[in-house]
Amino acid sequence: PDIPTDGMDRRAYLRAKFGGEARAQRGYAAIARAGISAGIEFNFDAIDWTPNTIDSHRFVRYAQQLGKGAEAVERVFQSYFLEGRDIGDRSVLVDIGAELGFITDRLDAYLDDTSTIQNILDHNARAHRLGISGVPAFIVDGQFSISGAQEPAVIGRLLDVARERQRELLAGEVTG
């Protein structure tokens, strides 16, 4: 949601976020290796435009209301990271919605209603306060977070830290 409304050239985005394409490529290479081990073949070269994702987030919220949130997230991610589609483009989101069996007129009406934008921006601001700056992101117990592609050991450590904090809190209640 922090990208300009119309999105931006991918190379300009990579320079701004990572300090250059070469640094981004090193990070993407690690993500690609992790993806291959999970059976996912990322196609970062197909991405030439970095979209503003507010409507993508709103699309997922709509899908959640229909009980298809997980499917919507997966299809949006596939569309962007595997197919290089512009997931900030309303017509792309409506096409994905049609694939998922949504009534596209209703989806269009939902996306036309701008009243849900502030909620997305509020969630984004909260994520930034928690230190989240990329996807995927994990928040445990509302206070511990990591973002971006992480090794399983890092995620395990996050869970260990949260578990230890819960033990400390429970011990304080018992003795306090």
Tell me what each language-model feature is.
Residues 1-83, 169-173:
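Structural alpha/beta surface segment adjacent to cysteine/selenocysteine redox centers
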Residues 61-176:
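C-terminal cap of thioredoxin/glutaredoxin-like
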